[in-house]
């Protein structure tokens, strides 16, 4: 080695090939294949989720307890099997996340308390106007309301109500698991985190088109109004899906999106028209404006990744040679 001298050592150091990113599939000729596998996997998950709702033939409406029980069983089975799709995607693409599958999907203990509280607080701030409206229209005062909320009998009644279980527990948990925890890790290496935030909700929004079938079957309104309603529902579910995808990436946890989803299901779409006709219209409209303003002001600080520890999706992109700074910092 001494005979090589300084020039020889420099020559060896120059000629040594640099270590390539772990997943050449994302930067080489196979990048198209990786994206096709990711998109097809997400499409398959969405079809499986929606299709599971219709494996049970029934003439009863969707809100009938028997229908809710059967459909809840179906989506719980599909969502519990959905991580297998991520495993298959990992094998087909050769991508190694560097963390366990559960961690990648947002099941981890690091930073779990702020991840459960801060996104929900942020969402409640956004709904400041509707919460004020709910409080003004409630016949009971704050003390009586808290007694009802904290009473074990109230919770027991909720836990035996199939519609409440579907809207507040089963739908938020299974939808966030399938459409966020499973789809985002597969889409992010292909599209990057920013585009994935807006691509993932498209599957979520389209998945809600199946409500058209229910409405047409029972002729709940005219065909035109059904399709207008479906288009509106697609729009706001896609926007909501982008928001929970943003929360999932910025916190690295599934619990925040699930709790926010449950809260939004309880609140429903803000009744702006009712607020415009309310006897206390101006305080309500001020509450709506203040809520939106505070939400935009606090969106970045309350989702600062430093509050939640390491971010699995950001680590995944680092290992694949991609650089993401906007959502990861």
UniProtKB/Swiss-Prot annotation:
Its EC number is 3.4.26.1. The active site is at residues 175, 208. The chain crosses the membrane at residues 36-56, 75-95, 112-132, 193-213, 226-246, 254-274, 282-302. InterPro entries: Rce1, Rce1/LyrA-like_dom. It is a multi-pass membrane protein. It comes from the Eukaryota. One of its GO terms (molecular function) is metalloendopeptidase activity. GO terms for cellular component: endoplasmic reticulum membrane. The record marks 261, 265 as: Transition state stabilizer. It catalyses: Hydrolyzes the peptide bond -P2-(S-farnesyl or geranylgeranyl)C-P1'-P2'-P3'-COOH where P1' and P2' are amino acids with aliphatic sidechains and P3' is any C-terminal residue. It holds the Pfam family Rce1-like. Belongs to the peptidase U48 family. Protease involved in the processing of a variety of prenylated proteins containing the C-terminal CAAX motif, where C is a cysteine modified with an isoprenoid lipid, A is an aliphatic amino acid and X is any C-terminal amino acid. Proteolytically removes the C-terminal three residues of farnesylated and geranylated proteins, leaving the prenylated cysteine as the new C-terminus. Is able to process K-Ras, N-Ras, H-Ras, RAP1B and G-gamma-1. This is CAAX prenyl protease 2. It comes from Mus musculus.
């Amino acid at each position: 080695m001494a005979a090589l001298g300084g020039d020889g050592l420099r020559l060896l150091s120059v000629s040594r090939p640099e270590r390539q990113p772990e997943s050449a599939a994302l930067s080489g000729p196979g990048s198209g294949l990786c994206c096709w596998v990711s998109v097809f996997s997400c499409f398959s998950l969405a079809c499986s989720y929606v299709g599971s709702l219709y494996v049970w033939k029934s003439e009863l409406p969707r809100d009938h307890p028997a229908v809710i029980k059967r459909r809840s069983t179906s989506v719980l089975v599909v969502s519990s099997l959905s991580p297998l799709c991520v495993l298959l995607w990992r094998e087909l693409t050769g991508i190694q996340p560097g963390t366990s599958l559960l961690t990648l999907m947002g099941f981890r203990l690091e930073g779990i308390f702020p991840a459960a509280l801060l996104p929900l607080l942020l969402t409640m701030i956004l709904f400041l106007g509707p919460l004020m409206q709910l409080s003004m229209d409630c016949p009971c005062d704050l003390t009586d309301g808290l007694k009802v909320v904290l009473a074990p009998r109230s919770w027991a009644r909720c836990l035996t109500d199939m519609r409440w279980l579907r809207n507040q527990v089963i739908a938020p948990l299974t939808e966030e698991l399938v459409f966020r925890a499973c789809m985002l890790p597969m889409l992010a290496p292909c599209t990057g985190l920013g585009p994935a935030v807006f691509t993932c909700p498209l599957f979520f929004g389209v998945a809600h088109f199946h409500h058209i079938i229910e409405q047409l079957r029972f002729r709940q309104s005219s065909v035109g109004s059904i399709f207008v309603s479906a288009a509106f529902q697609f729009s706001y579910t896609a926007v909501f899906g982008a928001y929970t995808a943003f929360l999932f990436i910025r916190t690295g946890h599934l619990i925040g999106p699930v709790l926010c989803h449950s809260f939004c299901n309880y609140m429903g779409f803000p009744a702006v028209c009712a607020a415009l006709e309310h006897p206390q219209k101006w305080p309500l409209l001020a509450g709506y404006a203040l809520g939106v303003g505070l939400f935009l002001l606090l969106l970045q600080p309350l989702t600062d990744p430093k509050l939640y520890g390491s971010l699995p999706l950001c680590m995944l992109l680092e290992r694949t040679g991609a650089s993401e700074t906007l959502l990861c910092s």
